[in-house]
A protein has these predicted regions:
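ATP/NTP phosphate-donor binding region
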Residues: 1-90
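Short glycine/serine/threonine-rich phosphate/pyrophosphate-binding segments
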Residues: 19-20, 43-46, 73, 98-103, ...
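Short Gly/Thr/Asp-enriched flexible loops that form oxyanion-binding sites at enzyme active sites
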Residues: 50, 80, 99-113, 143-144
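A glycine/threonine-rich phosphate-anchoring loop and its flanking beta-alpha core
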Residues: 111-206, 214, 310-314
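C-terminal and late-domain segments of enzyme folds
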Residues: 180-233, 238, 245-260, 264
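Gly/Pro-rich interdomain helix-loop hinge
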Residues: 283-357
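Short, amphipathic C-terminal "tail helix"
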Residues: 354-390
Length: 390
């Protein structure tokens, strides 16, 4: 996507969240809202406020929560049936990447034939409005035309400009109550997006600008973000201004970083840091952001060593400067220091055959955005390092 297309998104909640949402639903005359959100939705600050608003405006809503992390195709199909039965006039997604990706696919597939597998059909635009609100700071799905679902245990990438959300609700309060482990894992996903959009073969001025700003916000705020007390009490009910609650500025900065990193990969798509992470995460049950960080932990120094093979090697120096480093190698070192500081990289229980299973599972097409053409021996070397030399 181009920067112009990305920035056409309409953002709600920049000033007065409640009033902006009220005006939005009234102006569009939405009467039947199909809500895609996890079971914790009613307990979220924005969940309570939306339910109160729906009641005041006489809006009916159906809460679809029948999906798991890393949503399955069959769960999306259940959502399509529920949306059709409810006859909703808008889809509202509230949650992390799984909720948003599920909603995106419900929107996209609803316009397709039920007589053929959805993933095999040609996608097309439809006029179902899609409103999203991310409650984590990592995937950036609120600002990308991508979704990820799984079929028979295999990752399926869905891409179409129709699922780039036209409307985004901005409200960072939910980040405060995330478990510390989830804060770290999602933060690493955002950082991976920003890094990969900078070194991508298709990196351009826009993706680098988005990525640079995202990394700056993360490095400036991540320690304060992780030190915030994990709570969701009356003190944080109602969107406080940064002046009223200085910690709100930290939450908003982290949310902005994840959003900018999402915009960055909307321009370039992801690279080997993601392509090599999916099977790794599946085998060892790792959160997606952590899996990408474990790959990039090996990949970033590898790229510094092999920069003579790289398309646009100057992007590595640009990335290094984002980490306040003067050389490519020093940039990679700074990244590794951040991972060490987070104390989240696990020791994997590697079984015989895992290495070859990982190497065999990589689809070369997913590596097409990477600035170095990775050979099988490169991939094996990287996985061997990721697995701890096993």
């Amino acid at each position: 996507m181009t920067r112009e297309e990305i920035e056409n998104q309409i953002v709600l909640g920049k000033k007065n969240l409640k009033e902006e949402l009220k005006s939005f639903f009234q102006e569009h005359s939405f009467r039947r809202i199909f809500l895609v959100a996890g079971s914790s939705f009613p307990k979220l600050p924005i969940g309570e406020e939306l339910q109160e608003l729906f009641s005041k405006l006489g809006i009916s809503f159906y809460h679809f929560s029948e999906f798991r992390p890393n949503p399955r195709l069959e769960e999306v199909e259940e959502g399509i049936t529920a949306f059709s039965d409810f006859q909703g006039d808008v889809i509202l997604a509230v949650g992390g990447g799984s909720a948003l990706d599920t909603a995106k696919c419900i929107k996209l597939f609803t316009g397709l034939s039920k007589d053929r597998p959805y993933l095999e059909q040609e996608y097309r635009e439809n006029d179902i409005p899609l409103v999203v609100h991310p409650t984590t700071a990592g995937t950036g799905s609120e600002s990308t035309p991508f979704a990820v679902i799984y079929q028979d245990g295999e990752k399926c990438s869905v891409e179409h400009e129709s699922i780039y959300p036209k409307y985004r609700i901005e409200d960072a309060r939910s980040l405060r109550s995330l478990p510390i482990y989830q804060k770290k894992a999602t933060l690493l996903d955002a950082l991976s997006h920003a890094m990969e959009a900078i070194w991508s073969k298709y990196s351009n001025e826009d993706s680098r600008a988005y990525g640079q700003k995202a990394i700056s916000l993360i490095l400036t705020n991540y320690k304060a973000y992780l030190s915030l007390e994990n709570k969701n009490d009356a003190k944080v009910q109602g969107k406080a201004s940064s002046a009223e609650d200085p910690s709100q500025a930290v939450l908003e900065s982290i949310a902005e970083a994840a959003n900018l990193a999402g915009k960055a990969i909307a321009v370039t798509k992801t690279t080997a840091g993601h392509a090599l992470s999916y099977k790794l995460g599946s085998i060892y049950q790792l959160p997606h952001g952590l899996a990408t960080a474990m790959v990039n932990r090996a990949l970033y120094p590898f790229m510094c060593r092999e920069k003579c093979r790289m398309i646009h090697p100057e992007n590595l120096l640009f990335l290094a400067k984002c980490f306040s480093a003067e050389t490519e190698e020093e940039g990679a070192k700074r990244y590794l220091e951040i991972l060490e500081d987070l104390e989240i990289i696990p020791t994997l229980s590697v079984k015989a055959g895992d290495l070859e299973n990982l190497v065999a599972a990589v689809n070369p097409e997913r590596l097409s955005n990477h600035p170095i053409a990775l050979r099988e021996e490169d991939i094996r070397l990287l996985y061997k390092e990721i697995l701890g030399g096993k």
